[in-house]
């Protein structure tokens, strides 16, 4: 019986590992909104291809999208290019599981060339965000489910922080919730083009 249980566990784990990140996201009902945006921005095909690297994706769950202000839907998610940029802000090249991180802060770069800070205490954190379900492994990367849609900015532009916090954390990420955050994100995207 013990051998059979271990065999079943191995087969189940192997089956999960054999799936790609897109397949895992598509099959998770809590991530269906994020999946629909990946699908609508043609990122699905890109993320399914085999590359010499893996991906790390911080996937906002459906509750995160439900909590977004209407302005995000009206001005960002309704525009194909902006929607794609917002989704890409949640993706890193390379596989970063919580097991790879020490308790110190690690700075990583998204595929849109924005720095984010990751750290781990008991759980994995993206600065100011809680990772609700970490380290879902796929054959081409790892998925971390987060509780909000990320907004990444230089700390000097974050009015919520003290000077000491701005000096200690040069990059801040938070949940996109206010008009100021939405306008800052739009401004940063527009300044790139």
Q: Model-flagged regions — what are they?
A:
Residues 1-6:
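Sec-dependent signal peptide recognition
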Residues 7-15:
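Hydrophobic h-region of N-terminal signal peptides that target proteins for export
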Residues 15-193:
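Mature, structured domains of secreted/extracytosolic soluble proteins
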